[in-house]
Regions:
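Short nucleic-acid-contacting surface segments enriched for D/E, G, S/T with interspersed K/R
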Residues: 37-50
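Short aromatic-glycine-enriched beta-strand elements
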Residues: 16-21
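Acidic-basic catalytic patches of nuclease active cores, encompassing PD-(D/E)XK
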Residues: 40, 72-104
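Short, charged beta-turn/beta-strand-edge "cap" motif at the junction between a beta-strand
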Residues: 13, 53-58
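Nucleic-acid nuclease catalytic cores
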Residues: 137-147, 154-186, 208
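Domain-level recognition of nuclease-like catalytic cores that cleave nucleotide substrates
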Residues: 173-226
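OB-fold/S1-family single-stranded nucleic acid-binding modules
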Residues: 56-72, 218-219
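Conserved catalytic cores of phosphodiester-cleaving nucleases, focusing on short active-site segments
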Residues: 9, 113-143, 156
Length: 226
Protein backbone atom coordinates (compact mmCIF):
# COMPACT_ATOMS: atom_id res chain seq x y z
CA UNK A 1 0.00 0.00 0.00
CA UNK A 2 1.11 3.55 -0.66
CA UNK A 3 0.59 6.92 0.96
CA UNK A 4 0.43 10.28 -0.79
CA UNK A 5 2.02 13.63 0.10
CA UNK A 6 4.21 12.36 2.95
CA UNK A 7 6.25 14.82 5.02
CA UNK A 8 8.85 14.36 7.77
CA UNK A 9 8.37 16.19 11.07
CA UNK A 10 9.68 16.21 14.65
CA UNK A 11 7.47 14.79 17.39
CA UNK A 12 6.78 17.05 20.38
CA UNK A 13 4.08 15.44 22.51
CA UNK A 14 0.80 13.53 22.49
CA UNK A 15 -1.88 15.13 24.67
CA UNK A 16 -4.34 12.27 24.09
CA UNK A 17 -4.81 9.06 22.09
CA UNK A 18 -6.03 10.83 18.99
CA UNK A 19 -3.72 13.77 18.36
CA UNK A 20 -0.08 14.76 18.61
CA UNK A 21 1.89 17.97 18.33
CA UNK A 22 4.78 18.00 15.87
CA UNK A 23 7.19 20.56 14.50
CA UNK A 24 6.72 20.96 10.75
CA UNK A 25 8.53 23.65 8.76
CA UNK A 26 9.39 25.50 11.96
CA UNK A 27 5.80 25.65 13.24
CA UNK A 28 3.83 23.53 15.70
CA UNK A 29 1.18 21.44 13.94
CA UNK A 30 -1.59 19.37 15.53
CA UNK A 31 -1.91 16.04 13.70
CA UNK A 32 -4.15 12.99 13.91
CA UNK A 33 -2.45 9.82 15.20
CA UNK A 34 -3.61 6.77 13.21
CA UNK A 35 -3.10 4.47 16.19
CA UNK A 36 -4.94 4.77 19.51
CA UNK A 37 -2.52 2.37 21.24
CA UNK A 38 -0.09 3.65 23.84
CA UNK A 39 3.00 3.63 21.58
CA UNK A 40 5.01 5.17 24.42
CA UNK A 41 8.20 3.44 23.33
CA UNK A 42 7.79 4.90 19.82
CA UNK A 43 6.57 8.47 20.23
CA UNK A 44 9.50 9.96 22.11
CA UNK A 45 9.99 13.74 22.13
CA UNK A 46 12.38 14.74 19.35
CA UNK A 47 11.96 11.62 17.22
CA UNK A 48 11.33 11.86 13.49
CA UNK A 49 7.79 11.03 12.40
CA UNK A 50 6.13 10.90 9.00
CA UNK A 51 2.84 12.55 8.11
CA UNK A 52 0.40 12.03 5.28
CA UNK A 53 -1.57 15.09 4.24
CA UNK A 54 -5.31 14.50 4.33
CA UNK A 55 -7.51 15.04 1.30
CA UNK A 56 -10.54 16.44 3.15
CA UNK A 57 -10.18 20.23 3.45
CA UNK A 58 -12.87 20.35 6.17
CA UNK A 59 -11.19 18.03 8.69
CA UNK A 60 -9.81 19.45 11.93
CA UNK A 61 -6.24 18.23 11.36
CA UNK A 62 -4.44 18.52 8.04
CA UNK A 63 -2.10 15.54 8.58
CA UNK A 64 -2.13 11.93 9.78
CA UNK A 65 0.87 10.57 11.69
CA UNK A 66 1.66 7.24 10.00
CA UNK A 67 5.26 6.24 10.80
CA UNK A 68 8.09 6.89 13.22
CA UNK A 69 11.84 6.32 13.33
CA UNK A 70 13.18 4.28 16.25
CA UNK A 71 16.96 4.07 16.14
CA UNK A 72 17.84 2.69 12.71
CA UNK A 73 14.35 1.23 12.19
CA UNK A 74 11.32 2.76 10.53
CA UNK A 75 8.03 1.62 12.05
CA UNK A 76 4.67 2.07 10.38
CA UNK A 77 2.11 2.76 13.12
CA UNK A 78 -1.02 3.20 11.02
CA UNK A 79 -3.59 0.91 12.69
CA UNK A 80 -5.58 0.63 9.45
CA UNK A 81 -2.59 -0.50 7.39
CA UNK A 82 -2.33 -4.19 8.44
CA UNK A 83 -5.74 -5.10 7.04
CA UNK A 84 -5.04 -3.21 3.83
CA UNK A 85 -1.66 -4.85 3.20
CA UNK A 86 -3.03 -8.30 4.07
CA UNK A 87 -5.87 -7.84 1.56
CA UNK A 88 -3.42 -6.75 -1.14
CA UNK A 89 -1.07 -9.63 -0.38
CA UNK A 90 -3.85 -12.22 -0.27
CA UNK A 91 -5.33 -10.94 -3.55
CA UNK A 92 -1.91 -11.38 -5.16
CA UNK A 93 -1.74 -15.02 -4.03
CA UNK A 94 0.60 -14.53 -1.09
CA UNK A 95 -1.67 -16.12 1.52
CA UNK A 96 -3.11 -19.03 -0.44
CA UNK A 97 -3.18 -20.07 -4.10
CA UNK A 98 -6.44 -20.15 -6.03
CA UNK A 99 -8.31 -17.62 -3.90
CA UNK A 100 -11.82 -17.10 -5.26
CA UNK A 101 -13.01 -14.35 -2.90
CA UNK A 102 -11.82 -12.17 -0.03
CA UNK A 103 -14.62 -10.96 2.20
CA UNK A 104 -13.73 -8.33 4.82
CA UNK A 105 -15.48 -7.89 8.17
CA UNK A 106 -16.91 -11.40 8.17
CA UNK A 107 -19.43 -12.21 10.90
CA UNK A 108 -18.83 -15.55 12.57
CA UNK A 109 -20.47 -16.57 15.83
CA UNK A 110 -20.54 -13.56 18.11
CA UNK A 111 -17.66 -11.72 16.48
CA UNK A 112 -16.78 -9.85 13.35
CA UNK A 113 -13.49 -11.21 12.04
CA UNK A 114 -11.28 -9.28 9.65
CA UNK A 115 -11.51 -11.61 6.65
CA UNK A 116 -13.05 -14.71 5.20
CA UNK A 117 -10.79 -15.90 2.40
CA UNK A 118 -12.45 -18.39 0.06
CA UNK A 119 -10.73 -21.05 -1.97
CA UNK A 120 -12.43 -23.80 -3.98
CA UNK A 121 -14.70 -25.53 -1.50
CA UNK A 122 -13.19 -24.08 1.69
CA UNK A 123 -13.44 -21.05 3.96
CA UNK A 124 -10.44 -19.60 5.79
CA UNK A 125 -11.23 -17.23 8.67
CA UNK A 126 -8.50 -14.68 9.33
CA UNK A 127 -8.07 -12.18 12.14
CA UNK A 128 -5.25 -9.69 11.47
CA UNK A 129 -3.26 -8.00 14.23
CA UNK A 130 -0.81 -5.19 13.55
CA UNK A 131 2.37 -5.26 15.62
CA UNK A 132 4.48 -2.18 16.38
CA UNK A 133 6.14 -3.10 19.70
CA UNK A 134 9.75 -4.26 19.28
CA UNK A 135 12.36 -5.19 21.87
CA UNK A 136 15.87 -6.26 20.85
CA UNK A 137 14.75 -7.29 17.38
CA UNK A 138 11.77 -9.30 18.58
CA UNK A 139 8.15 -8.19 18.26
CA UNK A 140 5.52 -8.43 21.00
CA UNK A 141 1.73 -8.19 20.92
CA UNK A 142 -0.28 -6.56 22.39
CA UNK A 143 1.22 -3.28 23.61
CA UNK A 144 -1.82 -2.77 25.86
CA UNK A 145 -4.49 -5.13 27.24
CA UNK A 146 -7.01 -6.16 24.58
CA UNK A 147 -10.13 -7.99 25.68
CA UNK A 148 -11.42 -7.79 22.11
CA UNK A 149 -8.29 -9.59 20.97
CA UNK A 150 -8.97 -12.40 23.44
CA UNK A 151 -12.56 -12.63 22.19
CA UNK A 152 -11.34 -12.92 18.59
CA UNK A 153 -8.93 -15.72 19.51
CA UNK A 154 -11.67 -17.69 21.25
CA UNK A 155 -13.93 -17.28 18.23
CA UNK A 156 -11.13 -18.57 15.98
CA UNK A 157 -10.69 -21.55 18.28
CA UNK A 158 -14.38 -22.41 18.04
CA UNK A 159 -14.12 -22.18 14.26
CA UNK A 160 -11.08 -24.45 14.18
CA UNK A 161 -12.86 -27.00 16.34
CA UNK A 162 -15.62 -27.22 13.70
CA UNK A 163 -13.06 -27.97 10.99
CA UNK A 164 -12.65 -24.51 9.48
CA UNK A 165 -9.21 -23.11 8.74
CA UNK A 166 -8.84 -20.40 11.39
CA UNK A 167 -5.82 -18.10 11.30
CA UNK A 168 -4.46 -15.39 13.57
CA UNK A 169 -2.19 -13.33 11.34
CA UNK A 170 0.34 -10.89 12.79
CA UNK A 171 1.43 -8.12 10.42
CA UNK A 172 4.65 -6.77 11.92
CA UNK A 173 4.92 -3.18 10.72
CA UNK A 174 8.73 -3.30 10.95
CA UNK A 175 11.42 -4.93 8.81
CA UNK A 176 13.95 -7.57 9.90
CA UNK A 177 12.16 -8.85 13.00
CA UNK A 178 13.52 -12.12 14.41
CA UNK A 179 10.33 -13.42 16.03
CA UNK A 180 6.87 -12.55 17.34
CA UNK A 181 5.56 -13.54 20.76
CA UNK A 182 2.57 -12.77 22.98
CA UNK A 183 3.30 -9.96 25.43
CA UNK A 184 2.53 -11.89 28.60
CA UNK A 185 3.83 -9.12 30.84
CA UNK A 186 1.24 -6.70 29.49
CA UNK A 187 -1.75 -9.02 28.99
CA UNK A 188 -1.31 -12.59 30.29
CA UNK A 189 -4.83 -13.59 29.24
CA UNK A 190 -4.04 -12.89 25.59
CA UNK A 191 -1.02 -15.19 25.64
CA UNK A 192 -2.95 -17.90 27.46
CA UNK A 193 -5.81 -17.72 24.95
CA UNK A 194 -3.40 -17.76 22.01
CA UNK A 195 -1.54 -20.84 23.23
CA UNK A 196 -4.79 -22.68 23.92
CA UNK A 197 -6.16 -21.77 20.49
CA UNK A 198 -2.98 -22.95 18.76
CA UNK A 199 -3.25 -26.26 20.62
CA UNK A 200 -6.79 -26.62 19.25
CA UNK A 201 -5.91 -26.04 15.61
CA UNK A 202 -5.75 -22.28 15.10
CA UNK A 203 -2.87 -21.40 12.80
CA UNK A 204 -0.74 -18.53 14.12
CA UNK A 205 1.31 -16.80 11.43
CA UNK A 206 3.50 -13.70 11.43
CA UNK A 207 5.10 -11.72 8.60
CA UNK A 208 7.30 -8.66 8.74
CA UNK A 209 7.06 -5.81 6.24
CA UNK A 210 9.11 -3.64 3.97
CA UNK A 211 8.53 -0.16 5.39
CA UNK A 212 9.26 3.20 3.77
CA UNK A 213 7.88 6.61 4.74
CA UNK A 214 5.22 6.29 2.04
CA UNK A 215 4.61 2.54 1.69
CA UNK A 216 4.07 -0.75 3.49
CA UNK A 217 4.32 -4.24 1.98
CA UNK A 218 4.27 -7.72 3.50
CA UNK A 219 7.74 -9.23 3.16
CA UNK A 220 8.53 -12.61 4.74
CA UNK A 221 7.34 -15.04 7.39
CA UNK A 222 8.93 -14.86 10.84
CA UNK A 223 8.70 -17.41 13.68
CA UNK A 224 5.99 -17.14 16.31
CA UNK A 225 7.21 -18.10 19.79
CA UNK A 226 4.37 -19.32 21.98
Amino acid sequence: MHYQNVRAAKFIDRPNRFIAHVELDGSVETVHVKNTGRCRELLVPGCTVYLEKGTNPNRKTAYDLIAVEKGSSLINMDAQAPNKVFAEWAAAGGFLPDVTAIRPEYTYGGSRLDFCVETEGRLHLVEVKGVTLEENGNALFPDAPTELGVKHIRELQRAAETGLDAVLFFVVQIRDIHSVAPNDATHPAFGEALREAAAHGVRVLAYDCDVTPDSLKIRREVPVIL
